[in-house]
Amino acid sequence: MNIIDELKWRGALNQATDEEGLRELTEEKKIALYCGTDPSGDSLHIGHLIPFMMLKRFQLAGHKPVILIGGGTGAIGDPSGRKTERDLETRSKLEQNVQSLTKQMIRLFGTENFTIVNNYDWLSKFTMIDFLRDYGKLFNLNTMLNKEVVASRLDAGISFTEFTYQILQAIDFLHLYRHNDVQLQIGGSDQWGNITSGIDLIHKVEGSDTKVFGVTIPLMLKADGTKFGKTAGGAVWLDPEKTSPYEFYQFWLNQDDRDVVKYLKYFTFLSQEEIAGLEEKVQTEPWKREAQRRLAQEVTTFVHGQAATDQAEKISAILFSGNIQDLTTAEVEQAFAGTPSVEVSAEPANIVDWLVDTKIEPSKRQAREDVKNGAIRVNGEKVTDLEATLDPTAKFDGKYVVIRRGKKNYTLAKVHA
């Protein structure tokens, strides 16, 4: 199957400047293509996986992906998809972010048949006179004003800095065409105007018959109409220090039946036959959640590796069984990273007093009632003795106490000396 046809089957293709021309080109030869991301943070998040999965599919088909980190454009701020102007980062902070993102991208793409570039390397060499003389005269103001990314901001106001962003992105495409033989730019649906600006610039400078293309990816929406990638707790990061592999795994495991097949097509490398089989399972045995489990396994392994997936599944099984004592200290940190936590001293205390002092229980009366009724578990073990003494350093290297009140209400007590 041609790579373009596969992208269409997977629901990954939204707009294309010349779909047939691109199909012919990718059948004739292996091409270089690029996607850009500005270093506005020190970690990628799952929203970045949307364009990166397309790049990865091209890479697996033998093409050469290039990721452009916007060390230069990041100092300006992309207005695409925004109602207000971005707060700009300092030069040193941007450079730190560039280094962090580079490490994560190498983890996803490896080093073979893959290139990372930073547009600061060429954009920073322009003087204002160079910029206006060599490029400013090639852009029509009326055309720029009619681009959706600009038109949507005119009433609220857009700075000249953000207004010129599309010119800088166009220069990027031209630079990569000249120096890296890049013939295709991909981006989110909000990048269409910026992508076509780059193609127009290349045609003006290199000739109208130059074979360059642009494609965009559909906006990823959940079945309930909300945007994919956000949770009640915020973004889901690819950095394991920001979102643990267990939390990452759980995000995918908890996807709605109405969304899971779409995500299997988009975020995994499973075949049509495998996905069709999982789709049938969703329809006939949805309670088994086999499709969600496979989705979680595939994406977690792609981002964090097989060992992290195995550990996430181990934690999940232990939490389901309630055998908290079987977790290691590191696994406790992962499993309960998103749960309410309290700071406690290392001093042993009566269980009832301790539950009230930590505010896990609202009163001694309620604490006594819950203990007597067997509703309190300490590190996985039920406590029913009102006179029991709790030693915070007894488990997990003396660092944590895991309290469960009722069936699902966990609190992580962090022990300090």
From Swiss-Prot:
Compartment(s) where it occurs, according to its Swiss-Prot or TrEMBL record: Cytoplasm
Record-listed ATP binding positions: 230
Keywords: Aminoacyl-tRNA synthetase, ATP-binding, Cytoplasm, Ligase, Nucleotide-binding, Protein biosynthesis, RNA-binding
Extent of motif 'KMSKS' region: 227-231
GO MF term list: ATP binding; RNA binding; tyrosine-tRNA ligase activity
Catalytic reactions on record: tRNA(Tyr) + L-tyrosine + ATP = L-tyrosyl-tRNA(Tyr) + AMP + diphosphate + H(+)
UniProt keyword Acetylation, yes or no: no
List of residues binding L-tyrosine: 34, 165, 169
Annotated EC: 6.1.1.1
GO annotation (BP), single: tyrosyl-tRNA aminoacylation
Motif ('HIGH' region): 39-48
Keyword Protein biosynthesis attributed: yes
Top EC group: ligase
InterPro entries per record: aa-tRNA-synth_I_CS, aa-tRNA-synth_Ic, Rossmann-like_a/b/a_fold, S4_RNA-bd, S4_RNA-bd_sf, SYY-like_C, Tyr-tRNA-ligase, Tyr-tRNA-ligase_bac-type
Domain spans labelled S4 RNA-binding: 349-415
One protein family per Pfam: SYY_C-terminal
GO cellular component: a single term: cytosol
Subunit field text: Homodimer.
Similarity remark: Belongs to the class-I aminoacyl-tRNA synthetase family. TyrS type 1 subfamily.
PANTHER family: TYROSINE--TRNA LIGASE, MITOCHONDRIAL (PTHR11766:SF0), TYROSYL-TRNA SYNTHETASE (PTHR11766)
Function: Catalyzes the attachment of tyrosine to tRNA(Tyr) in a two-step reaction: tyrosine is first activated by ATP to form Tyr-AMP and then transferred to the acceptor end of tRNA(Tyr).
Protein name (Swiss-Prot/TrEMBL): Tyrosine--tRNA ligase
Gene (UniProt): tyrS
